[in-house]
A protein has these predicted regions:
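Helical element adjacent to the flavin cofactor pocket in flavoenzyme catalytic cores
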Residues: 37-45
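Short secondary-structure junctions
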Residues: 44-55
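Conserved C-terminal structural/oligomerization subdomain of aldehyde/semialdehyde dehydrogenase
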Residues: 12, 56, 63-127
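Conserved NAD(P)+-binding/catalytic subdomain of aldehyde/semialdehyde dehydrogenases
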Residues: 1
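Aromatic/hydrophobic pocket-lining residues that form π-stacking "cages" and hydrophobic walls in ligand
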Residues: 4, 38, 125-127
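Flexible, acidic loop-helix segments that line cofactor/substrate-binding pockets
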Residues: 5-37, 55-63, 77-85
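Residues within well-ordered alpha-helical secondary structure of globular protein domains
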Residues: 6, 41, 104-107
Length: 127
């Protein structure tokens, strides 16, 4: 997880006309408010926390800082819903729960947009 966060730290955010920026403002105020809502709820939740990012600024554009949410609940709302903003939610599963966690990725969203596995074990990555 720490390697992943290191890569998030390297993401450059700014104006769309600067092609060195990887993330720019979200499309409109409604999208900004939606992203901010997810972040605010994660900050207040007992089963989730914002471990990186979480800042939002709409003074010049609708900028949402790349944000990492860590949850202990595999069915936490941002695990099951497509946010359309620079927010990712991480659920760390126990090795013994791999099959059940894989099934969660397959069943959480009808659109299959929300699940991904990151693993050091090549066998796990092949499944």
């Amino acid at each position: 997880m720490y390697v992943f966060i290191f890569h998030v730290l390297a993401i450059k955010v700014g104006d769309v006309t600067d092609f060195t920026n990887f993330v720019n403002a979200v499309i409109d105020e409604a999208s900004f408010d939606n992203c901010k809502g997810y972040i605010d709820r994660a900050k207040a939740a007992s089963d989730a926390e914002v471990i990186f990012g979480g800042n939002c600024d709409k003074s010049v554009g609708y900028f949402v800082e790349p944000t990492v949410i860590l949850t202990t609940n595999p069915k936490y709302e941002s695990m099951a819903e497509e946010i359309f903003g620079p927010i990712i939610t991480i659920y760390v599963y126990e090795d013994k729960d791999f099959v059940e966690t894989l099934e969660l990725c397959d069943s959480t969203s009808p659109y299959a947009l929300t699940g991904a596995f990151f693993a050091y074990d090549l066998k796990a990555q092949r499944i």
